[in-house]
Design a protein with these regions (language model features):
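Sec-type signal peptide cleavage vicinity
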Residues: 1-2, 10-291
Length: 291
């Protein structure tokens, strides 16, 4: 009995010192949300219901009292039918007082074209993303940062970080009787980059969405090869895949769109397009080019 009492005293002492507590509360994701108006949302995720049964990355950053952020866990979570999420493996609130936690989330998590997340600084998430050369394989990159009240449920609100781009074609005289679109290609546009996030940006786009800024951007080619309807008619018709591109406020002098038809290639320099219709690619926004 004396030995048992001594062990119990040691346990109690270890829990109380350094502002620690002994209770283990499960970290619960109580709500998954998604931001943006329906007409500007991404192609893959149009609402939070599209995230049901999907898996996203979830990183916990812990800041003890009067200290600096430190890693706590790096896991994943799967969205349930009721728009809660189950963390795998299960995570528990640390037994600390006067501490805080921040949760970083990113989607997609396990897709072959998913971004990679790094946390060299535990208080910052850096997403590295490379757009697939084929628009058919593009993914809708979402990001979220949550700072819940200690030991309360976590609400995760995802935002779109890329720009949705599509093409509409319409036959205008004197084009030949039958025109088909064989390929649509962006050349010398942003293809890969890094998105560093400590908070959701307070700077917004023209439609009030967070303006995510990608850095270390490398340019390249991204194309769509239509497989369904690709015939241009007198009625304006969307043709080709939806592109999900890195946002940019400044296109290079050599950036262009190359459209391949059954009659050959036609090039459209962005400098010429912008001269007639000034615009930029903003995160969470939808750009459609009429050709």
């Amino acid at each position: 009995m004396i030995m048992a009492m001594a062990v119990l005293s040691a346990v109690l002492f270890s829990c109380v010192r350094e502002e620690m507590t002994c209770d283990k509360e499960l970290i619960v994701v109580q709500r998954i949300g998604e931001g943006g108006y329906v007409y500007t949302r991404g192609a893959a995720i149009s609402s939070n219901t599209d995230l049901k049964e999907e898996t996203f990355g979830l990183y916990g950053s812990l800041t003890p009292n009067a200290s600096v952020p430190q890693p706590y866990f790096n896991a994943s979570a799967t969205v349930n039918a009721d728009l809660t999420a189950t963390i795998s493996p299960l995570q528990y609130w640390p037994g600390l007082l006067n501490a805080s936690m921040k949760f970083f989330s990113w989607y997609p998590y396990s897709d072959a074209n998913a971004p990679t997340a790094s946390f060299t600084d535990p208080g910052e998430m850096v997403l590295n993303y490379t757009a697939n050369e084929s628009a058919a394989n593009h993914v809708d990159v979402l990001a979220a940062i949550s700072g819940p009240i200690w030991v309360e449920g976590v609400n995760i609100h995802f935002y779109h970080t890329l720009t949705k781009v599509t093409f509409t074609f319409k036959k205008v005289a004197p084009v030949p009787n039958e025109v088909t679109i064989e390929k649509i290609e962006f050349q010398n546009v942003g293809k890969s980059g890094n998105l560093a996030m400590t908070e959701i940006p307070t700077t917004t786009t023209k439609n009030g969405k967070p303006k995510f800024v990608w850095s270390d951007v490398a340019t390249g080619r991204v194309a769509s090869t239509p497989t369904g309807n690709k015939t241009v008619t007198e009625d304006a018709t969307l043709i080709g895949d939806t592109f999900l591109m890195l946002p940019t406020d400044a296109f290079s002098a050599t950036a262009k769109i190359v459209v391949t038809t059954n009659f050959g290639d036609r090039e459209f320099l962005f400098s010429d397009i912008l001269a007639k219709n000034p615009h930029s690619w903003e995160s969470g926004e939808y750009i459609n080019y009429n050709l």
